[in-house]
Every structure is written in C-alpha cells, then in structure tokens.
Amino acid sequence: MLFKSYVYFLAGLLLVGLFTSCDADAQYEELVPGFFRKGGVSGVGDYKPIVVFGKSFNQFEAAEGAKG
C-alpha cells in the first residue's frame, strides 16, 4: 500500500514537471498580454492627467482634492 502511494506521488510529480516551465515570465506574459509592456501594476506607461473643470490634475492631486 505504501509503495503504491509512493508510485502515485512520483507519477504526479512527473506530470506537474511536464506541464510547468522554469521560464515563468513568458507564461505570465502570455496570460496577461501587454501587462508587462505597459509598466505593470503602477501603470506608468499609461499616465494621463485628469481634467476637472478645465484644470489638469495628476491622480495624486485629484485624490487629495477629493479628501478636503
């Protein structure tokens, strides 16, 4: 019984090894196309100023203005 469990465990590791890769960045880039090219989470590449009543704000100034 213990030997059978060991064989199933090794077979599972083999299957996981076949479907995974050491190059994880390429896989994530395929899952989320353009995510890394646009600056990632921060969105630095997509910066656009916010225009309110003809005056231009960046997102931090707009957030501070909303608080006060």
Curated annotation (Swiss-Prot):
Propeptide residues, chain positions: 25-38
Biological role stated in the UniProt entry: Horsefly salivary gland immunosuppressant protein that likely inhibits the host inflammatory response by regulation of anti- and pro-inflammatory cytokines. When tested on mouse splenocytes in the presence of LPS, it increases the secretion of the proinflammatory cytokine interleukin-10 (IL10) and decreases the secretion of the proinflammatory cytokine interferon-gamma (IFNG) in a dose-dependent manner.
Compartments in which it is found: Secreted
Top-level lineage group: Eukaryota
Listed name of the protein: Tabimmunregulin 12
GO cellular component: extracellular region
Record keywords: Cleavage on pair of basic residues, Secreted, Signal
Signal peptide: 1-24
Organism whose genome encodes this protein: Tabanus yao (Horsefly)
Main location class: secreted
Tissue-specificity statement: Expressed in salivary glands.
